[in-house]
Amino acid sequence: MGRLHDYLRGAPDGVAALVSVELCSLTFPTVKPTVSGLVGTAMFGDGAAAVVAVGDRRAERLGATGPDILDSRSRLYPETLHIMGWNIGSAGMQLVMSPELPAVVEKHLADDVTGFLAAHGLTTGVVGAWITHPAGPKVITAIAATLDLPAEAHELTWRSLGEVANLSSASVLHILRDTIAKPPPAGTPALMLAVGPGFGSELVLLRWH
C-alpha cells in the first residue's frame, strides 16, 4: 500500500492496482516433516487480494469515498534475519518462524508506531481503526500489549485469523476490506500495520472521508 501511494503521488490523475497472491501451502513439509514445521504451516492459508486506488485529482472528480493514504513507513530491524522467512532447498520451502518473534515486536514496534503517528500530530488513542496483520495469536497479543490497545481494536484481525488463517501479505488487505465494509466516521485516522520477513514492519496511515 505504501508503494501504491508513492506511485499515485506522482500520478494524481492515475489509477493503480496492487495485487497480492500468497501460496503458503508451498511450505508444507512433505519431506522429513517436523512437529514445528507442521504446526507452523497450519497457521497459514493460500489467498489473494487486490486493491484499486486512484490519485487525488481523479478521486476528487469521481467523488470517491473510502480511505485516503496519508503516509507510509518501512522499518527493517537489525540482526533479525533469523526471526522469520524461508529456507529454500532441494526439499522445497521450509518455514522459519522463531519463538523470539513476539519479543522482537515488543522491543521495536511501540517506538515505531508512536513516532510515526507523532509526526502527524496523532497518538494511538485517536486511531479509530487498526488494520493489523494477523501474524499469529502471540504476535497479535504482543502488538496490543506494547501499544496498550483495547480488546476491540483487533476484533477484525482475530476474526480473519480464525476464519481464513494467516494469508501472509494478503491478510491485511482482507482486513482492510472488512474495515471498508463497516467504516469509521469521516475524518477518522486509521493505521495499517504488518510485520514480515527481514524482520521488519510496514505502517500505512489512512484517513476516512
Features from the language model and the residues they span:
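Short beta-strand segments
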Residues: 15-22, 53, 192-196
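Active-site-adjacent elements of ketosynthase-type condensing enzymes
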Residues: 18-39, 71-89, 136-145, 166-174
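Short coil/turn connectors at secondary-structure junctions
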Residues: 10-16, 38-39, 47-48, 64-66, ...
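Condensing-enzyme catalytic core mediating Claisen C-C bond formation in acyl metabolism
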Residues: 30-107, 111, 115, 195, ...
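Stable alpha-helical structural segments in soluble proteins, enriched in small hydrophobic residues
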Residues: 112-120, 171
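Claisen-condensing/thiolase-fold acyl-transfer catalytic domains that form or cleave C-C bonds
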Residues: 1-9, 106, 110, 128-209
